[in-house]
Every structure is written in structure tokens, then in C-alpha cells.
From Swiss-Prot:
Membrane topology: Multi-pass membrane protein
Residues exposed to the Extracellular side: 1-7, 72-101, 149-187, 260-265
Extra remark beyond the main annotation: Most taste cells may be activated by a limited number of bitter compounds; individual taste cells can discriminate among bitter stimuli.
Sequence intervals crossing the membrane: 8-28, 51-71, 102-122, 128-148, 188-208, 239-259, 266-286
UniProt KW keywords: G-protein coupled receptor, Glycoprotein, Membrane, Receptor, Sensory transduction, Taste, Transducer, Transmembrane, Transmembrane helix
Protein name (Swiss-Prot/TrEMBL): Taste receptor type 2 member 42
Function: Receptor that may play a role in the perception of bitterness and is gustducin-linked. May play a role in sensing the chemical composition of the gastrointestinal content. The activity of this receptor may stimulate alpha gustducin, mediate PLC-beta-2 activation and lead to the gating of TRPM5.
Family: Belongs to the G-protein coupled receptor T2R family.
Organism: Macaca mulatta (Rhesus macaque)
Listed GO MF terms: bitter taste receptor activity; G protein-coupled receptor activity
Amino acid sequence: MATEMDKIFLTLATVEFIIGMLGNVFIGLVNCSEGIKNQKVFSVDFILTCLAISTIGHLLVILFDSCVVGLAPHLYATDRVRRPVTMLWHMXNHLTTWLATCLSIFYFFKIAHFPHSLFLWLRWRMNRVIAILLTLSLFLLIFDCLVLEMFIDXSLNIIDKSNLTLYLDESKTPYDKLSLLKILLSLNSFIPFSLCLTSLLFLFLSLVRHTRNLKLSSLGSRDSSTEAHRRAMKMVMSLLFLFIVHFFSLQVANWTFCILGNNKYTQFVTLALHAFPSCHSFILILGNSKLRQTAVRLLWHLRNYTKRPNPLPL
């Protein structure tokens, strides 16, 4: 039977799921309808649509995982449920993280200005760079799945023991193996985090350089390019903030699971972990002019619909 803490956890998890689904379904529908209408798909729309689809899948896995953890946590002691759910969660998390990183890099190449020949060469081949990064992420996903298989096997061996403390005192080998595998999984998450941080830093340097050039030429500090820099920086910075919360929550959740198992503390740490797939869609909507304008029109129509007087009953 679910306790009060379980009910609170499930309520918060459901709220995160609804928020995330609203934003990502909106992004997917708008971009798909625009692509069908224009018979052309731009790179940014393709990345946004793939990110929305990946996040929707991630949110569905998260909801199922939260229901199992809150209502039937004993199922995770068996390999039949735990292995496929954990694999699907990590795959969806990996794809969502890398697609968000590719989007940050895309905005960096699209908006930043550097006279360096290497930057110009990469910018000219921006679509190829994004394709290479996505291909690299697929190879890393295979490596991640192999490491995760070993991680699940080792953790299930520990869960099968009736006394975890006695077992760890008798032999440190399983715990050491889990720690090593956890480090490998963390390094795999660190790569997109570093790329996103690097994109933000270079965007900031480009903004500083562009603003200084405008002041030297007596054109002021506000023009279309400067505003584009600032909008991109706000969006990437917001994504990076959620990314930081997501990254560190992932590390804390995994280490807490290794030490304490699947208990109440681990449950509520995962709520912070799920903030990234739940909230980043609204940052993307605010940062994209087409999505933002469509959202404003939709809210305006909803507002007018709610204000419409109800017809009198006959």
C-alpha cells in the first residue's frame, strides 16, 4: 500500500510529466505542421522535432518508472522489470541530452562571430558537424548500454544478498566494481555537459567582442546581432542550468542507489533529475520566435474561448 510519501512523490512526478508533455507535444506538432505545409525542413526544426520526440519517450519511461517505484518497488529487485526500464531510461536520457547539446552548438555556430579560420570552416560545415556529433552520440550510446548491462548485473547481485552491510564487509569487490562502472557512466554524461558549457562560453566571448566593436564604431550597443546573441545566451544559459541540475542529480541518484538502494531518498532525488526533460521545452519555445509566436496565438485563442459567454439552455 502506498504511504503518504509515496503519494506525494507520485503527485509531483505526474505534474512533471504533464508539464513536459504539454511543451514537447506542442513543439512536435508545430514543427511537423510547418514542415508539411512548407515541404521543407530546416536544420533547427529537425533538431527540435527529434528532441521533442525523444523527450516524449523519455517522459513516458519516467512516468512508468515513477509508478513502479511509488507503488511496487519490489519489482525492481527482479531482472525482468528493472533491466528493460533502466535501459530505456538511459537510452532516452542519452538521446535527449545529446540532442539538446547539438541544439546549443547549432545556435553557437549560427549566431557567434569569430574571424578565426577554424571557426569559419566549421561554421560553413555546420550541418556536417551536427551529423558527426549525433553519430558520435550513437557510438557512445552503445558503450553506455554495455557499461549499464554490467552495472545492472553487479547491482542485482548485491540486491540478492539479505544483508548488504555484511556482504560489503566480507568482500569489497562488488561495491568497487559498481563504483568503477558508475564513474564510466558519469564520464559519458560529462561529454555533452562540457560541449554545452563550451558553447555558452564562446557565445559570451562573441557577445563581448561584438559589443566592443559597436562601441568603437559609435553605433551603440543594441542592434539585431546583439539581441540575437543575448537571446541565444539566455536560452543556452537556461538549458545549461537545467543541465547542471540534471547532471549532478544523476550522479547523486546513482551514488545514493549504490549506497542506500532504492529508498525514499533516491525517489525524491530523481524528481530534480527529471526537471530537465520536463522544463527545457518551455525554454526552447521562448527562445524560438516561430514557436513563441504560435504559443502566443494559441493562448490568445484559448483566452477568447474561455471568455465566450455560454449559450442559455432552452
